[in-house]
Design a protein with these regions (language model features):
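PIN-domain endoribonuclease scaffold, especially VapC-family toxins
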Residues: 1-56, 68, 87-92
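Histidine- and aromatic-rich ligand-binding microenvironments
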Residues: 2, 59-60, 82, 94-95
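Acidic active-site catalytic centers that drive phospho-/nucleotidyl reactions
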Residues: 9, 63, 82
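Acidic, metal-associated active-site segment
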Residues: 60-76
């Protein structure tokens, strides 16, 4: 499971590092097997409020949207190397 916000962030990263051919592979081979949660106005607003209220500048809107979505769906484990997910109480893989 992922969100459309993560897809946007991933596409930008893949395009920047690997080019358009990699974007095509990502879109055709990886995206179809993902469960995508499309973020609505309420989740976006809740995540944005966390970003604005946070005392640190390294907290991204995409991460906050992920936290909010995971909590709403009861997801407890994240595939991530981002330490912030562990700080938020999620189980991170790889450990």
């Amino acid at each position: 499971m992922t969100t459309n916000y993560v897809l946007v962030e991933t596409c930008a990263l893949v395009q920047n590092r690997f080019g358009m051919r990699a974007i095509k592979v990502f879109q055709e081979d990886i995206v179809p097997v993902l469960r995508i949660e499309w973020i609505d106005k309420a989740v976006h607003h809740a995540a944005m409020q966390v970003v604005i209220a946070a005392p640190r500048k390294k907290l991204s809107l995409v991460d906050c949207v992920s936290y909010e979505t995971m909590r709403l769906l009861g997801v407890t484990t994240a595939f991530t190397l981002d330490k912030h997910f562990k700080e938020q109480g999620f189980i991170c893989l790889p450990a």
